[in-house]
Amino acid sequence: MSDLFTTIETPVIKYEQPLGLFINNEFVKGVEGKTFQVINPSNEKVITSVHEATEKDVDVAVAAARAAFEGPWRQVTPSERGILINKLADLMERDIDTLAAIESLDNGKAFTMAKVDLANSIGCLRYYAGWADKIHGQTIDTNPETLTYTRHEPVGVCGQIIPWNFPLLMWSWKIGPAVAAGNTVVLKTAEQTPLSALYAAKLIKEAGFPAGVINVISGFGRTAGAAISSHMDIDKVAFTGSTLVGRTILQAAAKSNLKKVTLELGGKSPNIVFDDADIDNAISWANFGIFFNHGQCCCAGSRILVQEGIYDKFVARFKERAQKNKVGNPFEQDTFQGPQVSQLQFDRIMEYINHGKKAGATVATGGDRHGNEGYFIQPTVFTDVTSDMKIAQEEIFGPVVTIQKFKDEAEAIKIGNSTDYGLAAAVHTKNVNTAIRVSNALKAGTVWINNYNMISYQAPFGGFKQSGLGRELGSYALENYTQIKTVHYRLGDALFA
């Protein structure tokens, strides 16, 4: 094998892993010859090393994307774009076990959950394949002697920076609408989880995309990510990640060429349970809402607010439910929670847990690492929490949840809106009027009623306040990747007097 590919064996499958930067439909080494290690979070061992993109590599990838956008990609019809995206989805479906195994390997998510992610990733691509030939403008009746119409044109070269918590799902969320709308892409993977996106990159060429349309590079935010954000020949940047980094990207975009920006950022989402809620249903969804994907979800229901009438009963039963979540080897069939993605993330979460203990909150269950190897953390439930505590205000991004008591609807809304974030929220109640009133009052981009974490690629997703700018998914995402041109065609012969 060359240093651009290696053979990796997982408990599920043995496969050939690309290691290079995918630029112009080829895997290549980085200009500076740098590589970095990819760690298995389940055992803390090195899986392999991949080539690292630096600023120079971003320049090469952007040049390839620009050449494709100005050249062959312009000649591909919208219907043909849709066919290509569908072909890519077909290839991902063919290799779904391989892709899911890769995500379990370098991300640590349960293999069964990874397959669900892949199904949604494939579905998302097919959804946008269907949109490719349905993007259109309108005619506007301004006066009898003028034909006025609008065109929705592609933005151009799009820089896309995806996170490590849902590598291929975010890959599809980004490239689906961008490519459907006729743009070209330079996508940077997270340095913790580059492997599945690199494998999927080889499917891009197999699907028949022209060279340069989709370029996939691996690298670090401080170098490759910064270069994308400030690049003068990138027309739009999309980022999913922390609010802190989102601010940096927005500043870089403004200081460079004022490129369009979409940001899907952090959250501290309230999951509100009223006295009249179906408590079994609420506990089930609240458990899924926080501990799914090891708590590494931007929209995780990390603050459970319970009305005082059922608070004690809820806490006791929720604690029991959390203790039933199996933490362990992501390749075992019944594993629900795998390891956190990295040592850095593990340490950060443990720091928050220790801070909560010192602040006076009570650990109802968990509060420590799980096992002696890997970045595993016990599902952790804090009670006796006040809204001013750090663990109730800041995004922890791990399997840690706070439970607070509220008296009435007004207090629930007040506590629910008491952070800087506004990505998501949930309301559990049997009263339709309560559900509608509270969902309307919550400052959140998505509100679930009597469920949690049910995101659909057909519906928009994004945040209020410091949880982001713009919307992913649904037809709304296409607005991020098109720009509107108005054309006034003079039909009459009269000269301007």
Curated annotation (Swiss-Prot):
InterPro entries linked to this entry: Ald_DH/histidinol_DH, Ald_DH_C, Ald_DH_CS_CYS, Ald_DH_CS_GLU, Ald_DH_N, Aldehyde_DH_dom
Top-level division of the source organism's lineage: Eukaryota
Keyword NAD included in the entry's annotation: yes
Pathway of action: Alcohol metabolism; ethanol degradation; acetate from ethanol: step 2/2
Gene3D superfamilies xref list: Aldehyde Dehydrogenase, Chain A, domain 1 (3.40.605.10), Aldehyde Dehydrogenase, Chain A, domain 2 (3.40.309.10)
Enzyme Commission no: 1.2.1.3
Site for Transition state stabilizer, residues: 165
PROSITE patterns reported for this sequence: ALDEHYDE_DEHYDR_CYS, ALDEHYDE_DEHYDR_GLU
Class of this enzyme: oxidoreductase
Reactions that this protein is recorded to catalyse: an aldehyde + NAD(+) + H2O = a carboxylate + NADH + 2 H(+)
Membership in a protein family: Belongs to the aldehyde dehydrogenase family.
The name this protein goes by in its record: Aldehyde dehydrogenase
Source organism: Emericella nidulans (strain FGSC A4 / ATCC 38163 / CBS 112.46 / NRRL 194 / M139)
Gene name, Swiss-Prot/TrEMBL: aldA
